Amino acid sequence: MQSAAIQDLSKERDKLKGEVEELHAAFKKLLAGNRREKFINPDQQLLEFPDDKELQAALDAAKREAEQEVETITYTRNKQKKEAKPRTDSFPAHLRREETVKPLSDDDQKLADSGREVFRQLIQEVLCYKRPELFVRAYFQLILKEAQAENTKETIEKLRAEIPAGLGEKGRYDASVAAAIACGKFELHIPYYRLQDIFASSGWTPSRSTLDYLMDLTAEAVQELPLLMTRRVLQSNCIGMDDTGVKLIMPKEIPEIVQGDLRTQRLIEKMLEAKKEGKTSLDAKMWAYSGDEDQPYDIFDFRVSRHRDGPAELLAGYSGHVMADCYSGNLNVVLDPKSSMTRMACWAHARRKIFEAKDNDRTASALPLALIGQLYDIERLAMDWPSEKRTAIRQSDSRLILDRMRAWLDGSVAQSILPASKLGQAVQYIRNHWDALCVFTKDGRLPVDNNWVERLMKRIAIGRKNWLFVGSVRAGMRNANIMTLVASAHRHDLDVHMYLVDVITHLNRGTAKLEQLLPDIWKASHPEAIRTYREEERRDKAELARLRTASRISQS
């Protein structure tokens, strides 16, 4: 009896010891480790499958196709280099030049006066920076001095009605000021107190309440546009979604219950829970939903909790695909018996779990990492292909690799991994969500992972480090609407300030159709607002990744 108890204690000790070692390794990596999930396969033979003739034939065909891809990409890149304009040391021609001309010496001036030709020789150009400039646009009306007072008043009121509508009392603030604040806080993640310094350096020192007031007015003016983007996103074939935490300052008073208002109901629940624990803030959530390439908008939704109410309310009636993490709240919404949505799971999440466990068992983790790597090789090669062609290669090559992965999951190596170990948990994660992980092979338009939505979360994470908290539920909802405009403009490589100025101006005046202000449509008529260097940078990066992938496959 005592011996059995000792054995149980020994097993428990070994289990706890293993957990401590895993936590210690994770902590060391968090502090000083490389966070890149780069995996170099220690045994390239793992990528060969002589026992599986169908898969080996597909891999051989992929190598031949990769060789052709290398030739195509190399030819295209070399052609682009030849056609590229030679780089010069001169600054852009459209920048204003302030000229400083040094006069001739006295002796040379005499020669010039006698008829010697003089020409100007550029010695050097120096780039200078002038801080942003604020100015006041004053409107005047000429009035006859003898005019009656009532006629003068009528003329002034008529003129005031003709002045372009601004924001605030009597329209005192132009849309350009509101756009500058919105870009500062939601694109560049600058808190209000630092925005004060920026404006003060240009001669105007606004209070933080004034800056916040202008954001209120901005959100009110543009509120219909985020709603339109949301409706468009719900027409997507696939929606990516994710969420992250935001600190919400505890409201002073518990609001009254409103029948059917789930937001208020969740707020009351969270407040009562926080007050019971003695907290002064609430752990709210900012959700992000991203449409596909046919509905290219990124929308944000502020909620006081991670309860399923948020996605359930926003996705009500949606019948497409949903790519999200495997949080139970998401699963309950997508897998609800009344739902017609198709759940997808993220291969980047699956890979990350195995990668984080590889130090505990490098031998067992090598094959699944290599197989997932091959899935991504196919995705990189097919990145710019038509969706029909991408569907075909997924149905052939990707499907065979997934079959090999399934065989490994059901095989002796995976079965022998301790379920409680980190690798065992990663393997079980893939087993649990296998069907959702394989959905992408059915349609070339579907994504293989949720990375593009996770990048949206970085916007909130960086902003959170600067502005620290949200002051109220209303402010959270307001911020979500403005962030929707900023992120969607950024997705289309637009100058966000130029876009917001135009959007705020037209919506405040009611002088444009809402659809014309969607960033993809607006972009087509405003080429001067496109950050072409970002488009070129992304295109070059993707092309280089395809070239490296094709080269590696063709040489393996």
Each PLM stretch: what is its role?
Residues M1-G171, G240-M241, K247, G260-K279, ...:
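Short, flexible loop/hinge motifs at secondary-structure junctions
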Residues G33, D108-K110, E146, I181, ...:
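Mobile genetic element proteins and their domesticated derivatives, centered on retroelements
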Residues M1, Q7, L23, R131-N237, ...:
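Short, positively charged, Gly/Tyr-enriched micro-motifs
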Residues R172-A179, E187-I190, D298-D336, G476-M483:
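Structured ligand/cofactor/substrate-binding pocket environments in proteins
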Residues C238-I239, C326, L335-A370:
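Conserved beta-strand -> loop -> alpha-helix junction used to position metal-binding or nucleic-acid-contacting
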Residues V118-R120, E154-K158, L248-M250, I257-V258, ...:
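Short helix/loop capping segments that flank catalytic or ligand/cofactor-binding pockets
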Residues G317-G320, A324-L331, A370-S556:
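Acidic/histidine-rich catalytic cores and adjacent linkers
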Residues R87-P92, R96-A112, Y193-E313, G317, ...:
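Gly/Pro-rich turn-and-neighbor structural signature
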